[in-house]
Every structure is written in structure tokens, then in C-alpha cells.
């Protein structure tokens, strides 16, 4: 019954609506799929899960989390001295991890790992251009 009804659904071209009657098919009006190319300086590519970009991002984030967890990088419980040696201190943050790796450490190391990964990906792209 709903498939034979005619209704006016607003159709947009740019910012201005164009009102024209169109048949309702189920609950969703059928729209043709069109591919649009990015207009900006950066284009988005969705590659497969084993792509080079994905491997770089996973590796850089994993290595940074590993370094933070096992005491190779400064964290909330280990501060760096002037000679870049890590010394243990009490940060006052509660954690259930035996090494004292906190949520703040996880977020910070994950962020730095992503920054390193993006730098590697963009650096390799400029070399290939």
C-alpha cells in the first residue's frame, strides 16, 4: 500500500530545495548512487586492511604503546631527567596495571604513535610523487 502512494519529498540541489512528486518505495526514497571525487587538497582512500598505510599506522601506534608500557618512554609515573634518564615517581593516578600504566599514558602514547604514523605516511607519499 505504501509503495503506490505519491508524496512530495524535498529534493536538494545545492542549498535550494526542489519540490517534485516522487513515489515512495518502502520507507526510503531510492536515490541513484553517484561517485564524487574529492575537491580538496586531501583525498580519502579506503584501502584494504593489509594496505601499507594501515600497516604503518598499526605498527607505529603499537611500538609507541609498547615503549610506554615497558618503561622506554616517559609516562605519568616515569619522568625524564636532564640526562634523559627515566626515574620513577608517584603521580597519584590509580591504575590496576602492575607496571603502573595509566589511562593518561595510554591516550598519550596512542596519540604520539598516530602522529608518528601520519608523519611516515605523508613523508612516503611525498617521496613517491
Curated annotation (Swiss-Prot):
<feature type="transit peptide" description="Chloroplast">
    <location>
        <begin position="1"/>
        <end position="46"/>
    </location>
</feature>
<keyword id="KW-0934">Plastid</keyword>
<feature type="transmembrane region" description="Helical">
    <location>
        <begin position="48"/>
        <end position="68"/>
    </location>
</feature>
<dbReference type="InterPro" id="IPR000549">
    <property type="entry name" value="PSI_PsaG/PsaK"/>
</dbReference>
<keyword id="KW-1133">Transmembrane helix</keyword>
<keyword id="KW-0472">Membrane</keyword>
<dbReference type="InterPro" id="IPR035982">
    <property type="entry name" value="PSI_centre_PsaK_sf"/>
</dbReference>
<dbReference type="GO" id="GO:0015979">
    <property type="term" value="P:photosynthesis"/>
</dbReference>
<keyword id="KW-0793">Thylakoid</keyword>
<dbReference type="InterPro" id="IPR016370">
    <property type="entry name" value="PSI_PsaG/PsaK_pln"/>
</dbReference>
<dbReference type="InterPro" id="IPR023618">
    <property type="entry name" value="PSI_PsaG/PsaK_dom"/>
</dbReference>
<protein>
    <recommendedName>
        <fullName>Photosystem I reaction center subunit psaK, chloroplastic</fullName>
    </recommendedName>
</protein>
<keyword id="KW-0809">Transit peptide</keyword>
<dbReference type="Pfam" id="PF01241">
    <property type="entry name" value="PSI_PSAK"/>
</dbReference>
<keyword id="KW-0150">Chloroplast</keyword>
<keyword id="KW-0812">Transmembrane</keyword>
<keyword id="KW-0602">Photosynthesis</keyword>
<dbReference type="InterPro" id="IPR017493">
    <property type="entry name" value="PSI_PsaK_pln"/>
</dbReference>
<dbReference type="GO" id="GO:0009535">
    <property type="term" value="C:chloroplast thylakoid membrane"/>
</dbReference>
<feature type="transmembrane region" description="Helical">
    <location>
        <begin position="104"/>
        <end position="124"/>
    </location>
</feature>
<keyword id="KW-0603">Photosystem I</keyword>
<comment type="similarity">
    <text>Belongs to the PsaG/PsaK family.</text>
</comment>
<dbReference type="GO" id="GO:0009522">
    <property type="term" value="C:photosystem I"/>
</dbReference>
